[in-house]
């Protein structure tokens, strides 16, 4: 049994021999969203020598120039705006050797209707450029998420399914760009014989990417670093249900492993799967872990005194600039590394748990210890000098 089905924390931190002779690759990946929280893990894991059907040749696509924290990955980096069909056609259609597409990106708009339009267009642009031009294209992995079962953020109070959330639950009666993406995927794969697909639905992701719009661990690290700098208590910015109730999460490396499994295992084709760590935790316990990692006083949930990170952090830009200067950190702006709105949603609501039974029934036995996962990603945020 390979390491990615054994749940090894940090297994992807192996290094590739830079003097290794060039080889002919049977597997060629296109990662769309390579600087995202899962795309970054895919870029680290796919090129490893013991990855199934690997090592892989990897193309990585992102809108912005390549960041320094992504430079060690042995991939071909392509800066491309996938909302721009002309840019996509020019830069992606020449990649005729691609065998697998890992689509792990999204864009945020002010309404779900606009989310559907923009995110649908992005996916369609990529598939229109790749499917007709890649004769050996075998499989497309589409990453969506648990909002498939819960609804869009703007519809957060609609009637939802009763957990545990299973893959066979019907769609909610509301707009959801995940549904738009799935429909586009199902339509486009029909255009090429034997082309298969998989859909992956993680929960709250623990991982590393300063560019991610939904980076909970990185955001909490920034919050804790500011509390440490100011000598403040690490107050819990959430609700009682999140503090006392059971939560789960999805390790970014585990999600990457899950997608690779679905891409190469015949028994995982043409299916949608949940992907979470396989255990549960309480934020009141993880809050102590976070406080210990930064040497700050741990706060508690305060009944009737709920706070939001968006409010606590709204004037902290100059404080963050000072922390960056004094500690020689990578140059970042607070608004780039602090996803306060997302953290407030996660910690301001009870967690709706899913189940991994379907993945296990189809042969994926990967898991993570969520506490160890949390600590390992905090360590990585520190190692790349995002926080002191």
From Swiss-Prot:
EC number, as in UniProt? 1.3.1.122
Q: Which SUPFAM superfamilies does this one have?
A: NAD(P)-binding Rossmann-fold domains
The entry's active site is 147, 178
Q: CDD domains annotated for this entry?
A: 5beta-POR_like_SDR_a (cd08948)
Record-annotated residues binding NADP(+)?
35-37, 63-64, 81-82, 105-106, 143, 178, 205, 212-214
Q: Which UniProt keywords apply?
A: NAD, NADP, Oxidoreductase
Principal EC category: oxidoreductase
User: What Gene Ontology molecular function terms does this protein carry?
Assistant: oxidoreductase activity, acting on the CH-CH group of donors
Q: Which InterPro entries match?
A: NAD(P)-bd_dom_sf, PRISE-like_Rossmann-fold
Assigned protein family: Belongs to the short-chain dehydrogenases/reductases (SDR) family.
**What name has this protein been given in UniProt?**
(S)-8-oxocitronellyl enol synthase ISY1
- Name its species: Nepeta racemosa (Catmint)
């Amino acid at each position: 049994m390979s390491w990615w089905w054994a749940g090894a924390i940090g297994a992807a931190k192996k290094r590739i021999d830079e003097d290794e002779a060039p080889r002919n690759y049977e597997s060629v990946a296109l990662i769309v969203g390579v600087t995202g929280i899962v795309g970054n893990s895919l870029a680290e894991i796919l090129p490893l020598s013991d990855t199934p059907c690997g090592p892989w040749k990897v193309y990585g696509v992102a809108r912005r120039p390549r960041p320094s924290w992504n430079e060690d990955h042995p991939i071909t980096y392509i800066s491309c705006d996938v909302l721009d069909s002309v840019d996509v056609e020019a830069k992606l259609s020449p990649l005729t050797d691609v065998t697998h597409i890992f689509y792990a990106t999204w864009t945020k708009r002010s309404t779900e209707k606009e989310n559907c339009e923009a995110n649908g267009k992005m996916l369609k642009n990529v598939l229109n450029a790749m499917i007709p031009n890649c004769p050996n294209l075998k499989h497309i992995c589409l990453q969506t998420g648990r909002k498939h079962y819960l609804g869009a953020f703007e519809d957060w109070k609609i009637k939802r399914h009763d957990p545990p959330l299973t893959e066979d639950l019907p769609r909610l009666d509301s707009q959801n760009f995940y549904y738009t993406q799935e429909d586009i995927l199902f339509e486009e794969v029909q255009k090429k014989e034997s082309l298969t697909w998989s859909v992956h639905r993680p929960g709250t992701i623990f991982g590393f990417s300063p560019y991610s719009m939904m980076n909970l661990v990185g955001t909490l690290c920034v919050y804790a670093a500011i509390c440490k700098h100011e000598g403040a208590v690490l107050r819990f910015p959430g609700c009682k249900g999140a503090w006392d109730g059971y939560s789960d999460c999805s390790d970014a490396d585990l999600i990457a492993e899950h997608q690779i499994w679905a891409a190469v295992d015949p028994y995982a084709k043409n299916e949608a799967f949940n992907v979470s760590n396989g255990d549960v935790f309480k934020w009141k316990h993880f809050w102590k872990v976070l406080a210990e990692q930064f040497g700050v006083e741990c706060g508690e949930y305060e009944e009737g005194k709920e706070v939001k990170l968006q409010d606590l952090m709204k004037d902290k830009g100059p404080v963050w600039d000072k922390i960056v200067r004094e500690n020689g950190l990578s140059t970042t702006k607070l608004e780039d590394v602090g996803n306060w709105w997302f953290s407030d949603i996660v910690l301001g609501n009870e967690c709706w748990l899913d189940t991994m039974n379907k993945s296990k029934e189809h042969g994926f036995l990967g898991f993570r210890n969520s506490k160890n996962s949390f600590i390992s990603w905090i360590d990585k945020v520190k190692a790349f000098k995002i926080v002191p």
